[in-house]
Amino acid sequence: MDAFATSPTSALIKAVNCIAHVTPMAGEDSSENRRASNYKPSTWDYEFLQSLATSHNTVQEKHMKMAEKLKEEVKSMIKGQMEPVAKLELINILQRLGLKYRFESEIKEELFSLYKDGTDAWWVDNLHATALRFRLLRENGIFVPQDVFETLKDKSGKFKSQLCKDVRGLLSLYEASYLGWEGEDLLDEAKKFSTTNLNNVKESISSNTLGRLVKHALNLPLHWSAARYEARWFIDEYEKEENVNPNLLKYAKLDFNIVQSIHQQELGNLARWWVETGLDKLSFVRNTLMQNFMWGCAMVFEPQYGKVRDAAVKQASLIAMVDDVYDVYGSLEELEIFTDIVDRWDITGIDKLPRNISMILLTMFNTANQIGYDLLRDRGFNGIPHIAQAWATLCKKYLKEAKWYHSGYKPTLEEYLENGLVSISFVLSLVTAYLQTEILENLTYESAAYVNSVPPLVRYSGLLNRLYNDLGTSSAEIARGDTLKSIQCYMTQTGATEEAAREHIKGLVHEAWKGMNKCLFEQTPFAEPFVGFNVNTVRGSQFFYQHGDGYAVTESWTKDLSLSVLIHPIPLNEED
């Protein structure tokens, strides 16, 4: 069966387990006076996706045993004696292959040992070593000051001219510069210097492998990349290297396929849930289950976080529909009623809404309450008040944007972003993920409420998600008649051209990343994995909106990656 079809499958729809009776309204299905969304139907065949739950890629037992054996070999490799730069390069390869989560403690132990080593002769005056050391240490929570790059400057304070010929060093410097904080001017200089020189030489690099790495990095730096997506690309790339370690490559392929088989089962179960709700038949809203699962894998791909992915995908799929109701389909009166019901977390008054909108609302309630029940059963914590609060806050932000649209009000960029960093909806997913993963002794009503208050880490995550979304979707959304986005707000406020406005928003993206980077080192009540969730949702947005709206419209780049990450296992050699 093909993974794609021209329209969603006409599978049997089972009755949704609603908590209220929806009274039909006169003219409830009328499209009169409603704006057209112009959304294309999902290109994914839901019958095929459901089949993944039972006929997913079964990893053979011999491959599971082989993976365990190779894992021990790689662990010994990490702990083995080698030159410091070689150790850093091994760790870099492991991370890019998507294997960091398998060797978290070993990697941190080796990096901390290199950090404590008082000898600096191996990295000082070596651009590649200095930059790679800086990036890997910061990525793994060990602070290194930007001053380590001072030795690479000449007497005039500029980077030494001979460094322009060191392509590998420039690439490492480029990647390191994206971990900078606000006020770290030296790293800003490093970013400009490395970007300029890499662009100058990218077409004339003699090594094909290095040339591909440079072009890949210039398209998207590692720090902005989703680990699971990057791993799928890098496994193929690593196989082409002259000095490839066969056992490391084999383990990376096996582990990728093992995790993929788990993801396939999860996706199949989610597709069944989606079809059973009946929401896949609503044509006036986006049908985005597959995109949301890809996003869930960007947020957290590790096998042990299946419940986090499940809740995040369900909520995100409903969020897209609720967003469309507020942005395009619902009348202002209907949106007021919808918001009031969610704010009270009480379905009284739902009979005042059209059936289609009521279906979305009831599925939202049922899903949130089920997640809350699972939390109470599994963790002994009542999370429903916090999930309900996140939904209520989100709907109020949506309503504000709808009122702006209906009144013709044009917000300033600052006003728009203050509302938009919450209306982008990731606070809801992050609150739920926090409730699911926080250490139980630290999980309290107050700590959960703090996440809902949008503290700095969550704020930067929301801001970046909003900015990426606007860069990718604003043109299509304005054509549909949606609320003005950040680009249009800036144009209206300053008189700038669209091109200039886009450059300004891109500048805000770079600055917001600096704020996020600093948050990763500041004292907060949060720990892993929650900190990583915040950063990784942004990386998912970067992927979907890098070349346009790859979320609402299944573009070739999102479709191809979805197939390679979720559907097709990596081929193994016959002897494997």
UniProtKB/Swiss-Prot annotation:
Q: Name one GO molecular function term.
A: terpene synthase activity
Could you list this entry's UniProt keywords, alphabetically sorted: Lyase, Magnesium, Manganese, Metal-binding
Coiled-coil stretches noted in the UniProt entry, renumbered to this chain: none
Ligand binding (Mg(2+) 1): 323, 327
Which Pfam families has this protein been placed in? Terpene_synth (PF01397), Terpene_synth_C (PF03936)
CC cofactor: Mg(2+); Mn(2+)
Residues engaged in binding Mg(2+) 2 = 323, 327
Tell me which Gene Ontology terms the entry assigns under biological process.
diterpenoid biosynthetic process; geranyl diphosphate metabolic process
Protein's UniProt keywords contain Magnesium:
yes
Q: Which Gene3D superfamilies match?
A: Farnesyl Diphosphate Synthase (1.10.600.10), Terpene synthase, N-terminal domain (1.50.10.130)
| Positions of disulphide bridges | none
Q: How is the cofactor bound?
A: Binds 3 Mg(2+) or Mn(2+) ions per subunit.
Residues bound to (2E)-geranyl diphosphate are 286, 323, 327, 466, 469
According to its UniProt record, the EC number is: 4.2.3.112
**Free-text note on domains in this protein's UniProt record:** The Asp-Asp-Xaa-Xaa-Asp/Glu (DDXXD/E) motif is important for the catalytic activity, presumably through binding to Mg(2+).
Family affiliation: Belongs to the terpene synthase family. Tpsb subfamily.
- Kindly provide the name given to this protein in its UniProt entry: (+)-alpha-terpineol synthase
